[in-house]
Amino acid sequence: MLCPICQDTNSRVLESRSAESGKSIRRRRECMNCQHRFTTYERIEFLTITIIKRDGKKESFDKSKLLRGIIRSCEKTGIEVSQLEAFVNQIEVELQGKCQREITSAEIGEIVLSKLSGISEVAYIRFASVYRKFQGIRDFVDTLNHLQNQKENLEFTATVPQNSEISLQQDVINV
């Protein structure tokens, strides 16, 4: 490692420790030439993810832009910003796990919506209204119905014992 004082490349590591929640290693070094002590960091180099927008334009993934949009949709819901930062970090990890250099904004929007539905229904509706470009009340109603159906399906699956036979019967009533 190059010494910042004398530019010598000969140094020794005095101490190493994990930093930034395990995403980097902090090393304390000493130059063998001038005995100057300095700190270096080793970080994982993530894939550069390119977002393909609806209009076909491409831009680099901007974690802070995603966070701003999610914070806006979660205003006055009582969700802490630190929780939202962790939420965005999870999304970034998921995107990195796909090992794709390019991903559509639609894919990211769907990932966000699937995760928001478990956190806040209000935030889900707000995010969906911007992401899906709602044109009127019908779009809100359709999304609310979809969210309600998802919730009912989850509740139904949670009450059904595993490995049991289920017989569903539909009653039709003519009025």
UniProtKB/Swiss-Prot annotation:
At the top level, the lineage of the source is: Bacteria
Q: Which Pfam families match?
A: ATP-cone, Zn_ribbon_NrdR
Does the record carry Zinc as a key word? yes
Q: How is the cofactor bound?
A: Binds 1 zinc ion.
Membrane-crossing residue ranges in chain numbering = none
Extract one GO molecular function annotation from the record. DNA binding
Q: Which InterPro entries match?
A: ATP-cone_dom (IPR005144), NrdR-like_N (IPR055173), RNR_NrdR-like (IPR003796)
The segment(s) forming the ATP-cone domain are 49-139
Q: From its record, what is one biological process in GO terms?
A: negative regulation of DNA-templated transcription
Tell me if Metal-binding is a UniProt keyword of this record.
Answer: yes
Annotated unnamed zinc fingers sit at: 3-34
Cofactor(s) the protein needs: Zn(2+)
Q: Which UniProt keywords apply?
A: ATP-binding, DNA-binding, Metal-binding, Nucleotide-binding, Repressor, Transcription, Transcription regulation, Zinc, Zinc-finger
Q: Which family does it belong to?
A: Belongs to the NrdR family.
State the function annotated in the UniProt record: Negatively regulates transcription of bacterial ribonucleotide reductase nrd genes and operons by binding to NrdR-boxes.
Mind telling me what this protein is named?
Answer: Transcriptional repressor NrdR
Question: Which organism does this record belong to?
Answer: Trichodesmium erythraeum (strain IMS101)
Organism phylogeny: Bacteria, Bacillati, Cyanobacteriota, Cyanophyceae, Oscillatoriophycideae
